[in-house]
Amino acid sequence: AMGGEPKLCLNIMAVPESMPKEAVHDILRGGYDKVYEAGALITGGHSIYDDEPKYGLAVTGFVHPDKVLTNSGAKPGDALFLTKPLGIGILTTAEKADLLSENGKAFAVRLMTTLNKAARDVMVQYRVHACTDVTGFSFLGHASEMATGSDVQLEINTAAIDLIPEAL
């Protein structure tokens, strides 16, 4: 979320001891496939046993020092773009409680496995002043952090925000 190009990645994984090795392999293979799609390499990682499965990547990349984007560079008059619909956290929480439909699961997986590479490739062609990735801190949390860090006010057209229907 800084405008850089990913180059090297480390796997970070926690799995229950009872998880089948095939499932662990599939998770790691999926990570490898996405890293390859992004044009980067996995150079190692770390794994532990835990009751709840978790997988992520620590990513190192490169960006020209004059083109580093942070969440505190927004300027008055900037437009705010969302590259994915909001609500994925609600879907994943619903899945943990076995409340998510099969369509909802498929949609969540598709969103979570879609790289932000296309958005990044478009973004670096323009004079972007700030960016962030909406995570568990929520859209409003990230918007507040961006506004405060940039010393600007945000005007949000809530009708224009793409929301995941099943998250409502």
Set out the residue ranges of the language-model regions.
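Helix-biased detector of long, well-ordered alpha-helical tracts
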Residues: 1-168
